[in-house]
């Protein structure tokens, strides 16, 4: 989300990896496409609800709560896939999400653009979205303005969970399954780098959906270029770490 509560992203990669594995496992077991997609999104929603409960009700610091659930999700994913990659074949109605094209445009690109457009409108032009943004940017100031910050934090966690759950499903379709890697740290560093690099597009340093999307495409292109030139994933993470630091400094 376009706020500076970056600690909320701690478990993003782990949740995407979990729902990706879940969708792959269900499809391998013969579950319907609709059930696999719904299950992935539902698990994302559940994790968002758990994070919200830990932060809002139990009052565990955000960083600690999301870090804890990240480790739990990594453990669940390792147990679920038994440390093995889950590979699926092309499945009508599912593979089209990650591999399909309309003319020369990838379907997954259109899905991402559509979701981002909806989020941009939501955060910029709706009362609920603006209040969620204000709560994430400065909870204390939002409270002083009379906003029900607990309500908007809950909505933020739930919406984040839904989006990350769906992202895992898309990743499963795009990669024809799920890898055995459960850390999710690559996804985390990319998400943080895109969010903070996107803030450089604003004169006030404001994080935004559009800036994040543009930065995300830049980071994806950069990562692919580095891979083509023989750079390892570990080295790419180092490069993205430098980009993250520079983005914050800017």
Feature names for model-found ranges:
Residues 58, 62-125, 152-155, 174-180, ...:
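Transmembrane helix-bundle core of multi-pass membrane transporters
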Residues 164, 175, 179-238:
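Transmembrane alpha-helical segments in multi-pass inner-membrane proteins
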Residues 1-6:
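Short, small-residue-biased leader/transition segments that mark boundaries at the very start
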């Amino acid at each position: 989300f376009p706020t500076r509560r970056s600690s909320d992203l701690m478990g993003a990669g782990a949740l995407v990896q979990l729902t990706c594995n879940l969708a792959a496992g269900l499809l391998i077991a013969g579950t319907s496409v609709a059930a696999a997609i719904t299950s992935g999104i539902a698990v994302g929603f559940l994790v968002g609800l758990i994070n919200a409960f830990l932060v809002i009700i139990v009052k565990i610091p955000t960083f600690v709560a999301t870090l804890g659930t990240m480790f739990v999700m990594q453990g669940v994913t390792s147990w679920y896939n038994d440390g093995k990659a889950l590979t699926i074949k092309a499945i009508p109605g599912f593979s089209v999400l990650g591999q399909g094209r309309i003319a020369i445009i990838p379907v997954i690109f259109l899905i991402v653009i559509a979701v981002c457009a909806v989020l941009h409108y939501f955060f910029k032009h709706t009362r609920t979205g603006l209040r969620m943004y204000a709560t994430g940017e400065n909870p204390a100031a939002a409270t002083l303005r009379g906003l029900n910050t607990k309500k908007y934090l809950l909505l933020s966690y739930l919406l984040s969970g839904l989006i990350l759950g769906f992202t895992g499903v898309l990743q499963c379709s795009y990669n024809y399954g799920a890898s055995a890697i459960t850390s999710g740290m690559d996804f985390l560093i990319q998400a943080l780098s895109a969010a903070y690099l996107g803030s450089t597009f604003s004169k006030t340093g404001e994080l935004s959906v559009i800036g994040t999307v543009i930065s995300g495409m830049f980071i994806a292109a950069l990562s692919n270029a580095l891979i083509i030139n023989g750079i390892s994933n570990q080295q790419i993470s180092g490069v993205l770490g430098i980009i993250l630091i520079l983005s914050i400094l800017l």
